[in-house]
Design a protein with these regions (language model features):
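Active-site-proximal, structured, solvent-exposed surfaces of multi-pass membrane proteins
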Residues: 1, 27-161
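Aromatic/acidic, Gly/Pro-rich catalytic loop(s) in extracytoplasmic/lumenal soluble domains
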Residues: 1-15
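Extracellular carbohydrate-recognition regions
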Residues: 21
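Calmodulin-binding basic amphipathic helices in cytosolic, intrinsically disordered/coiled-coil regions
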Residues: 24
Length: 161
């Protein structure tokens, strides 16, 4: 009866000064309406109060290991909480194609501020180390191929003379 699904919108963000204070507040918070955030995790321009549209919806429309897509319907600004572990090293969020910050919510989950009339929130796992590793792999493969060609070239002319 207390499950909130893959994503939901809250009407309030409650900030706490320390992780201990946040953990203590977890036992007393109604997560259906309130999200807990550490002071230093919340950008200064974020609103802490939201008036929820009674018809507002957020649904998971696509789920892959490295990509999650949510469809959003709201006529008022909102704050969405996602039942996904907050892992800042590699996960990027976009809202209608524009990058948005991912906020650490309720100590372990993700949150995103949603403006009125937004339609798609997408999370992608794109860690920098994977991109660097891919570049290094292609560079190594290229150098290996060049080495083979150079050795083959010299062997060919060595056997001809």
């Amino acid at each position: 009866p207390n499950a909130l699904g893959p994503a939901w919108m809250v009407s309030e963000i409650e900030t706490k000064a320390t992780p201990d204070a946040l953990l203590e507040a977890l036992n007393k918070t109604d997560f259906k309406t309130t999200a807990l955030v550490l002071d230093h995790d919340l950008p200064a321009d974020f609103s802490k109060q939201y008036t929820l549209d009674s018809l507002a919806q957020i649904t998971l429309s696509k789920a892959k290991p490295d990509q999650l897509t949510y469809r959003v319907q709201t006529t008022t600004p909102a704050f969405a909480v996602f039942s996904e572990m907050h892992y800042p090293k590699g996960w990027k969020a976009t809202l209608d194609g524009k990058p948005v910050p991912i906020i650490n919510v309720n100590y372990v989950l993700r949150g995103v501020q949603v403006p009125a009339n937004a339609s798609v929130i997408e999370f992608r796992f794109e860690p920098a180390v994977i991109k660097q590793g891919t570049r290094l792999r292609w560079l190594s493969l290229g150098l290996f191929a060049i080495s083979i060609l150079v050795l083959g070239y010299f062997e060919y002319f060595k056997t001809r003379s």
